[in-house]
UniProtKB/Swiss-Prot annotation:
Disruption phenotype: Mutant worms are morphologically similar to the wild-type but exhibit mild swimming defects and are lethargic with their movement being interrupted by frequent pauses when crawling on a food-free environment. On the same environment, in other occasions they display decreased rates of spontaneous reversal and steering, and slightly increased average speed. Homozygotes are fully resistant to monepantel but heterozygotes are partially affected by the drug with reduced fertility and slightly impaired movement.
Keywords carried by this UniProt record: Cell membrane, Disulfide bond, Glycoprotein, Ion channel, Ion transport, Ligand-gated ion channel, Membrane, Receptor, Signal, Transmembrane, Transmembrane helix, Transport
InterPro entries: Neur_chan_lig-bd, Neur_chan_lig-bd_sf, Neur_channel, Neuro-gated_channel_TM_sf, Neuro_actylchol_rec, Neurotrans-gated_channel_TM, Neurotransmitter_ion_chnl_CS
Free-text function comment from the UniProt entry: Betaine receptor that functions as a ligand-gated non-selective monovalent cation channel in mechanosensory neurons to maintain basal levels of locomotion. The channel is permeable to Na(+) and K(+) but not to Ba(2+) or Ca(2+) ions. Elicits current in response to betaine, very weak current in response to choline, virtually no current in response to acetylcholine and nicotine, and no current in response to glycine and GABA.
Result after altering P311L: In ox429; mild swimming defects and lethargic movement when crawling on a food-free environment
The protein, known as: Betaine receptor acr-23
Lineage summary: Eukaryota, Metazoa, Ecdysozoa, Nematoda, Chromadorea
CDD domains registered for this protein in UniProt: LGIC_ECD_nAChR, LGIC_TM_cation
Gene3D superfamilies xref list: Neurotransmitter-gated ion-channel ligand-binding domain, Neurotransmitter-gated ion-channel transmembrane domain
Family: Belongs to the ligand-gated ion channel (TC 1.A.9) family. Acetylcholine receptor (TC 1.A.9.1) subfamily.
Entries under PROSITE patterns matching the protein: NEUROTR_ION_CHANNEL (PS00236)
Record's bilayer topology term: Multi-pass membrane protein
Domain of life where this protein originates: Eukaryota
Designated gene of the protein: acr-23
Tissue distribution: Expressed in the body wall muscles that are arranged into four longitudinal bundles, some mechanosensory neurons, the head muscles and multiple interneurons. Not expressed in motor neurons (at protein level).
Annotated source species: Caenorhabditis elegans
């Protein structure tokens, strides 16, 4: 028994000597003192009904990734949590006026601050916890604990891609205690001069810009628990920089579509000389179907590039998807329209001329679409009109010779039946002055000065009239040769090519109408959609905050 008592005295003296050893740092003595009766697994709460107030502050350092298909935001931030630990406190005068001390994070109690919408369940993968800073508030008053740590938050964010790539997204981070209600732990945000989330050390992102931040404190009651839980909602408003998509996707697609429209409905020298038609409708319009199919294939590649950026959602149609849909529709319908132009042109090879109503509407529309009738077609019309005029003139001549024939026949009968005497030849003289005088015969022109007269009916009557044609028509063979119709007709090859010219002109006018129509549709679709998206992007950028 005496030996045991001696050993205890020795141990106490040794401990006292170590405590008074001036070589031991004051932090060691302070740590041993405050941790002597500390239980890090229990909440450091002394007074009942008074929760531990945790102040949370965030500083955004970098936006790492915005993943549209998987709907999450990956960012790097610096977090600071502050609270008063009532079990950690000391009198600075007892420890050489030491007011601060650094301790390991796993030596003290930490609040279970949880990011509710985190996609990473392991805190060690998102937080880098090292040390905590303890600042005493006085003996039996506790100490202010500051936990500073860098973190990478992978948060779920419901992205609204309606105006993609001119979109603005708001991603929310919800913080709170997972185990303690607000009767034990209560949360409060700490704001900065430039907003609830600090941006002083933020690194600019090439694809996104931060428009602003917001914070909202909410006390929410769950059905499982009778007491409310405190939640802090941090909203980060980011806006996409659309330059990449405009230059690499939208602009090339618009250029390809516009060039395709021009290629569909623009002909090169569609008319050549008469009776030797070689329209580009024959040669070039056949390639327009291939052009349309090739353009659609190139569009499918670009759509594949865009689809990688899109989530599989049916809630809305992104603006860029609407843009590509309209471009594909324009090219598809344009290909069908080009086929209809080819069909109209091919009607000329059948040989049937266009209907008069078709030509009438073509003549009306042509000036509005700035299509003039080709010179070769005007020459063909002029030549056909000249031949028609010549045919009518020859028809009138044949009609006059028929009158001469009947007059000569009546004259012969008159000579046989009428006795000698004076006879008036008013009809003969009138016919000479009105009809025969218009005939293109020099010999007939000699008798145009005759007037109504009376002459004896003798054998010299025909000679006194100076109308040898009356003697010529006395022969039936001569009369039949005069009455034979004389028509000047075009060769079948030339006649067919006149029809082809007409159908080519109808096709050219229809082609120009399609060109104007599809150009207007392209301008409204391409420029209109992108201007609308840019307007939304600009207004949110300047008027959101």
């Amino acid at each position: 028994m005496h030996r045991i008592y001696t050993f205890l005295i020795f141990i106490s003296q040794l401990a006292l000597g170590l405590s008074n050893n001036p070589d031991i740092p004051i932090q060691y003595e302070l740590a041993n003192n405050i941790m002597e009766n500390y239980q890090k697994g229990l909440i450091p709460k002394v007074r009942k009904g008074s929760p531990i107030n945790v102040t949370l502050s965030l500083q955004l350092y970098q936006i790492i990734q915005v993943n549209e298909p998987q709907q999450y935001l990956l960012l790097n931030a610096w977090a600071v949590e502050r609270w008063v630990d009532q079990m950690l406190g000391w009198d600075p005068s007892e420890f050489d006026n030491e007011t601060e001390i650094m301790a390991r994070h796993d030596d003290i109690w930490l609040p279970d601050t949880t990011l509710y919408n985190s996609l990473e369940m392991d805190d060690s993968a998102s937080k880098k916890l090292t040390h905590v800073k303890l600042t005493t508030l006085g003996k039996n008053q506790g100490a202010m604990v500051e936990l500073l740590y860098p973190t990478i938050y992978k948060i779920s964010c419901l992205l609204n891609l309606k105006y993609f790539p001119f979109d603005t997204q708001t991603c929310r981070m919800t913080f709170g205690s997972w185990s303690f209600d607000n009767s034990l732990i209560d949360y409060f945000p700490r704001t900065f001069t430039n907003g609830p989330i600090g941006l002083a050390n933020f690194l600019e992102n090439d694809a996104w810009s931060v428009l602003g931040t917001k914070v909202n404190r909410e006390e929410k009651k769950y059905t499982c628990c009778p007491v409310n839980y405190t939640l802090l909602h941090y909203d980060v408003v980011i806006q996409r920089k659309p330059l990449y998509y405009v230059l690499n996707l939208i602009a090339p697609t618009a250029v390809i579509t516009f060039i395709s429209i021009i290629g569909f409905f623009t002909s090169v020298n569609p008319f050549t000389n008469f009776c030797n038609v070689s329209s580009s409708v024959h040669d070039l319009r056949q390639e327009k179907i291939t052009l349309g199919i090739t353009t659609l294939l190139s569009m499918s590649i670009m759509i594949f590039m865009v689809s990688d950026k899109m989530p599989s959602t049916s809630t809305c149609v992104p603006l860029i998807a609407l843009f590509y849909t309209l471009m594909i529709t324009i090219i598809s319908v344009g290909t069908l329209a080009a086929s209809s132009v080819i069909f109209v042109q091919k009607l000329g090879s059948i040989g049937n001329p266009p209907a008069s109503k078709t030509m009438k509407w073509t003549h009306r529309i042509a000036p509005f679409v700035l299509i003039q009738m080709p010179l070769v077609m005007k020459q063909a019309y002029a030549k056909r009109a000249k031949e028609e005029k010549h045919r009518k003139r020859m028809s009138r001549k044949n009609s006059m010779w028929t009158k001469v024939y009947h007059l000569a026949r009546d004259h012969s009968k008159l000579m046989e039946t009428v006795p000698d005497g004076a006879v008036k030849f008013n009809q003969i003289s009138d016919f000479k002055n009105n009809d025969i005088g218009n005939m293109e015969s020099p010999r007939m022109a000699e008798s145009q000065t005759s007037e109504t007269f009376a002459a004896p009916m003798d054998t010299s009557f025909t000679e006194s009239l100076h109308i040898p044609e009356l003697n010529r028509v006395a022969s039936s063979n001569s009369i039949q040769s005069v009455l034979k119709p004389t028509e000047i007709q075009l060769t079948p090859y030339c006649t067919r090519n006149i029809v082809e010219l007409e159908w080519d002109w109808v096709a050219a006018v229809l082609e120009r109408v399609f060109l104007i129509f599809f150009t207007i549709c392209f301008l409204f679709s391409a420029i209109g959609i992108n201007l609308y998206g840019w307007y939304i992007w600009y207004t949110e950028n300047h008027f959101l905050f």
